[in-house]
Amino acid sequence: MKQAVIVDCIRTPMGRSKAGVFRNVRAETLSAELMKGLLLRNPQLDPNTIEDVIWGCVQQTLEQGFNIARNASLLAGIPKTAGAVTVNRLCGSSMEAIHQAARAIMTGMGDTFIIGGVEHMGHVPMNHGVDFHPGLANNVAKASGMMGLTAEMLGKLHGITREQQDAFAVRSHQRAHAATVEGRFAKEIYGIEGHDANGALIKVLHDEVIRPETSMESLAALRPVFDPANGTVTAGTSSALSDGASAMLVMEESKARALGLPIRARIRSMAVAGCDAAIMGYGPVPATQKALARAGITVNDLDVIELNEAFAAQSLPCVKDLGLLDVVDEKINLNGGAIALGHPLGCSGARISTTLINLMEHKDATLGLATMCIGLGQGIATVFERV
């Protein structure tokens, strides 16, 4: 079976969704700039050999509709002979794009893919046009479509306190800020034009969403936002609303080597799994267990882990049940996570994978895991290996 590898991976800075730096930049533009960036950074690659562009996006309407993968690839000037498809596994969409490209390579259905994802949550909100079938209530709890309430449920089931959530959120902002100041995001961020508060055109080079001033005291002052009477989940312990895109060049290993392109990581194993929609945030646990089994390793073999921080109340139960509580500060989300950087839905899977690969290089690590929960009760996971 052929081997799929990551040759390159980049992302936009994460822009604040409310009046942020990308308020006048469309989702197709964010996507196209990254596609062009991958080609500029890897001139040995002939664009005419691209098999397919696979792009994750959740809200496929308005500027993100009518197959944004194709719209963005045409905008980027990718040869018209390349295919393009937009995929939707909700929060796991761009990780699903990684998996689809890897499976195609493994089965000989192409050797060069551009994958990634985007979500402009300022232009197309998460709940835009959502209309759940009334009959779903026969099979799942009514609140299962309300992500914040599923986090409340999962946190209660696992005894996660308000203070634990606040501490996890503070850690996310502190680590993301430190990564910015120390230049650890520089290799993964691809600068994109945006606009400052006065409307002037600027080159955006840093994430806009991080709040380095976040403290236990400031978070303690916030009221629960999803269950005001009895809840513990606040806006401060939830993933920030942000706009962004991420992209990867995924190739068959021998083809990449023949072109003299770098092999930044191999895709060692992949998995998806389902769980109860009422505790959708638990999905990373069964997905990770599957991926580890397929890789023939245990959780203790992992050097670095990126767990998407949809909510602190969701992340902590996953950390606990994966047996990782004692190694959080050594292995998990070392550059912060979505609480600080935001969770542009279709972007996040490739974004956390990009951050993971850069962290693995920084730490000279061998094995890494990227995993995330998915609305309505799923999880997705990928094990990467540096060679």
Swiss-Prot record:
> PROSITE patterns this protein is in?
THIOLASE_1, THIOLASE_2, THIOLASE_3
Where does it mainly reside?
Answer: cytoplasm
Q: How does the record describe its quaternary structure?
A: Heterotetramer of two alpha chains (FadB) and two beta chains (FadA).
User: This protein is called what?
Assistant: 3-ketoacyl-CoA thiolase
Q: Where in the cell is it found?
A: Cytoplasm
Q: In which pathway does it act?
A: Lipid metabolism; fatty acid beta-oxidation
Transport among the record's keywords? no
Active site (record annotation):
91, 343, 373
Q: Name one GO cellular component term.
A: cytoplasm
Q: Name one GO molecular function term.
A: acetyl-CoA C-acyltransferase activity
* Family listed: Belongs to the thiolase-like superfamily. Thiolase family.
Reaction(s) catalysed (UniProt annotation): an acyl-CoA + acetyl-CoA = a 3-oxoacyl-CoA + CoA
Q: What does this protein do?
A: Catalyzes the final step of fatty acid oxidation in which acetyl-CoA is released and the CoA ester of a fatty acid two carbons shorter is formed.
Its EC number is 2.3.1.16
Q: Which gene encodes it?
A: fadA
Q: Which organism is it from?
A: Shewanella sp. (strain MR-4)
Q: State the UniProt keywords alphabetically.
A: Acyltransferase, Cytoplasm, Fatty acid metabolism, Lipid degradation, Lipid metabolism, Transferase
**One of this protein's GO BP terms?**
phenylacetate catabolic process
InterPro entries the UniProt entry points to: FadA, Thiolase, Thiolase-like, Thiolase-like_sf_Thiolase, Thiolase_acyl_enz_int_AS, Thiolase_AS, Thiolase_C, Thiolase_CS
- Enzyme class at the top of the EC tree: transferase
Give one Pfam hit by family name. Answer: Thiolase_N
